Amino acid sequence: EKIKEIFSKFQNKRLNNNLWKIDNVNKKVSNVFNSDQFISYSSYSSWIRKDKNIDAVINQYKDYEDNISIIKDSNFKNSKNYPNYFSYPNPLSEFPKGTIAGTCLHKIIERFEFRNDNNQELIDLIIEELNFHQIDTSLAFKVKDAILRIINISLGRELQNKKLVDIPNEYLIKELKYDLTLSYEGRNINSNDISNCFFLDQEYEFGEEYANKINDLQIMNKGFHSGCIDCVFPVGNKLEDSKWWVIDWKSNLISGSDNSDCLPRNYNYENMRNEMIKHHYPLQSHLYLLALHRLLKWRLKNYQPHKHLGGYIYLFLKGLPDFELFEKSKSEDISPGIFISKAPLKRINYLDNLF
C-alpha cells in the first residue's frame, strides 16, 4: 500500500508539463524500504530503454514517444500504386514533435467521446489541452480534423469494417491499467524467457526475426510489470460473441527521404512493420493481449480465447488519409497508418504461464 501511495503521488503530478520518470519513483520507494523489502515495478518503456538504440521517456504506466524515422521509399506492399490523396499531408503535419506533443494528443483522444458529434465541444477540449501543454492553439482545427480521421477510418475486414465511431461509448474502455506479476518458479524473468514466445505461432507477425531482437533488452526482473492500454473494445453482432481488441495510438513520424512528412503513403505495411520492430511494439502488443486475456477470463462467462480474444491494432495518428476519400475508393486494403494482427494464441498462453 505504501508503494502504491508513492506511485500515485508521482502519477498525479503534472507540473511544468514534465513526465515523471520511473527512476524518480524507485528512488523515493528505496528511501522507505530496505533492499530485502523492496518490490520493484517495471514497464515496457523501462525494458526497451535498455536497448541502446532507444531513448524513451516514461512514467509508471504510459510511454509517450514521438519517434522519427526516415525511409528510403514509399512503395506499398506488393508494389501497388497508391492513389494521389495518399500524398496529401495529414492534418498533424504542422503539429509539434516531441514527448509533450505526443502526450497532448493522447490526452485529447482519451477525453473525447467518439460518438459526440458536437464539434464545438471537441474544439473546446482540444484548446484546453493545447493550452495546458503550451502548444499553439491555432492548431486546434487541424487537430480536430485529425481526430475525425481517427474515429471515422475503416478498421478493415478483420473488424467487420467497423469504425471507432461505430462502437458504443459504454463498450469503449480507455486507459486500462494493469499489473502483471513477474515470477517464474521463484526466479527473475529474463529476456530469453520472453523471446521464446516469439518462436511460437510463426504464421503470425513478428516471429523468429523479432525473438532474436528481444535478447538485446537484457531484461531481468521480479516484482510487477505495469502498463496501460490506450483503448479496448469489442467487435461483433452480439456482445457475448464479440471479439475484443486492443488499440494503441502512436504519434511516430515516418518521413520520406525527400523530407516528406505525415504523408499516408509513408505509412505503408512495410514501413509500419519496420517501425514496430525498431521500437519493440511487438513486445508491448503481446503484453497488452496477455492483460486483456486475463481480464476477459475473469469477467466473461464461458470465455474462450479463440472466440473472444481478437488481436491488436496500432494506429499511427500522423499517417491516416482523408477518411471520406478512402471510403469513396472502396478499397479492400487496410488504410495506411493502421497495423493490425490477430491474437497469436500459443504465444499468449505461453506468456500466461510465464508471468
Question: Model-flagged regions — what are they?
Answer:
Residues 1-355:
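Structural signature of nuclease core domains in nucleic-acid processing machines
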